């Protein structure tokens, strides 16, 4: 909950007891923060053998945040969930293990924070194309035409800002849905 008055606001961003009462017994081990400029698209990332649960939020600016279900035993396998996270709406998005994750920066700049329940394992990192037509993510403000690769070439935001992906994010060649399995399906949730 956000408690505000004329002086500003106070917001509790994580409460272990309340998470457990809601059915989430998650032990977070690391907090991360990134800053990105408008048009940057990070993702879609996942770890195959060390899947991460993430609790994400934008502390400055606005992003469109996406989770894609990679659990082959799930009823929602291959489906995506997207939500606007911003410093204005103060929403958080809980992404369970077994999902690919990414976000697109919609504001001039955005600072993005996330808690994870496992450490980064560089040799286990993998990804998938942000524009895979089988998934069909409806990225807001993005215009362009699918050219059969994960490249950002030919894509921009409606205001003309070029879409900006890292070299690594451009090399992901497609969906790898069968790589991650978790035992109990859990849907991403706004909290």
Predicted feature locations:
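Non-catalytic, conserved peripheral segments adjacent to functional cores
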Residues: 1-91, 107-109, 116-179, 183, ...
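Short alpha-helical functional segments enriched in proximate histidine and acidic residues
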Residues: 102
């Amino acid at each position: 909950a956000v408690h505000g008055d004329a002086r500003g606001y106070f917001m509790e961003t994580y409460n272990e007891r309340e998470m457990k009462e809601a059915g989430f017994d998650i032990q977070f081990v690391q907090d991360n923060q990134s800053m990105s400029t408008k048009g940057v698209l990070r993702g879609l990332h996942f770890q195959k053998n060390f899947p991460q649960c993430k609790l994400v939020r934008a502390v400055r600016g606005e992003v469109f945040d996406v989770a894609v279900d990679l659990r082959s035993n799930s009823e929602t396998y291959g489906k995506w969930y997207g939500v606007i996270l911003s410093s204005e709406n103060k929403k958080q998005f809980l992404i369970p293990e077994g999902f690919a994750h990414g976000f697109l920066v919609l504001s001039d700049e955005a600072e993005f924070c996330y808690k994870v329940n496992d450490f980064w394992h560089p040799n286990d990192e993998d990804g998938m194309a942000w524009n895979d037509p089988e998934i069909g993510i409806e990225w807001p403000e993005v215009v362009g035409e699918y050219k059969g690769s994960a490249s950002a070439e030919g894509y921009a935001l409606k205001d003309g800002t070029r879409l900006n992906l890292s070299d690594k994010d451009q090399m992901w060649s497609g969906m790898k849905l069968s790589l991650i399995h978790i035992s109990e399906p859990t849907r991403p949730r706004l909290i």
